[in-house]
From Swiss-Prot:
The lineage of its organism: Eukaryota, Viridiplantae, Streptophyta, Embryophyta, Tracheophyta. It comes from the Eukaryota. The gene is TIC20. Residues 1-82 form a transit peptide. This is Protein TIC 20, chloroplastic. It is found in: Plastid, Chloroplast inner membrane.
Length: 253
């Protein structure tokens, strides 16, 4: 700031402004705001502006405390958080009426493949060798027919059944569900057979392998029989883990 050819620092200007009486400051502010508000049609009135400036210059802390809003204090809740019931699990659609007999019969067809292939594991279980000759004639023709097909036939079966039946809403939900469950059981059988080839010979032909294949045979056999029973009576087969995976594959209605 240059005044009469001399320089004045900002600190001296502030000190000089602090020494100005309140009345002189108010009058200067009034003249400044009055000149600036002449050209404005709307806004604060001159009396409101002068009252505000006088309160601010006179150190009206009570005015500021009344104008500044005070946020309400937050009280801690005395209630403790509780776990809610998990609703992420699936629910079977309500069965308003029993499915037609042809839908129940068609729902049993996907279980024929895992039912017959489960007998292949019975050959490894020595405990079941005396019973194989009695049941082998019932499964041998079907397995021979499957063996005559090309290798890619099972892959084509899974792709066609999944894309044309499981994923299509035109088919009944009951039928699509059993097709998906039958495919998953067959995949579990195939994975078990592939993994068994990586095991050492001592495990595959030893005493531990004998008990393992006996258990695997009964698990797959009775699971497939239970699914066939549920399909014939018009029910959803409640197989652990398999039902969850099958229900996820079916689009929502």
């Amino acid at each position: 700031m240059i005044q009469n050819g001399g320089t004045v620092s900002q600190g001296s200007v502030l000190c000089y402004a602090c020494q100005i009486p309140a009345k002189v400051a108010v009058s200067s502010i009034r003249s400044f705001w009055g000149h600036s508000l002449e050209n404005k049609p709307r806004g604060m009135t001159f009396t409101d502006m002068s009252a505000t400036s006088s309160l601010l210059l006179s150190g009206g802390q009570n005015f500021l405390s009344r104008t500044i809003p005070v946020l309400p204090t937050l009280h801690k809740s005395s209630t403790t958080p509780r776990a809610t019931k998990d609703s992420s699990g699936f629910r079977f659609p309500p069965m308003t009426k029993k499915p037609r007999w042809w839908w129940r019969t068609l729902s049993c067809i996907p279980y024929l493949l895992p039912f017959h292939q489960a007998w292949m594991y019975a050959r490894t279980a020595y405990h079941l060798h005396p019973f194989i000759p009695y049941f082998q004639p019932m499964t041998y023709p079907f397995l021979m027919a499957i063996g005559t097909l090309p290798r890619w036939s099972l892959i084509a079966y899974f792709l066609i059944a999944y894309l044309t039946i499981v994923r299509r809403k035109e088919w009944p939900h009951f039928f699509r569900f059993h097709v998906a469950v039958g495919m998953l059981i067959e995949i579990a059988l195939q994975v078990t057979g592939i993994v068994s080839r990586w095991m050492p010979r001592s495990f595959y032909w030893g005493k531990l392998g004998m008990h393992f294949w006996t258990t695997a045979f009964f698990v797959f056999l009775f699971t497939t029989i239970e699914c066939i029973r549920c399909a014939l009576v018009g029910m959803y087969a409640d197989v652990p883990f398999v039902c969850d995976a099958a229900y996820i594959q079916i689009p929502h209605e």
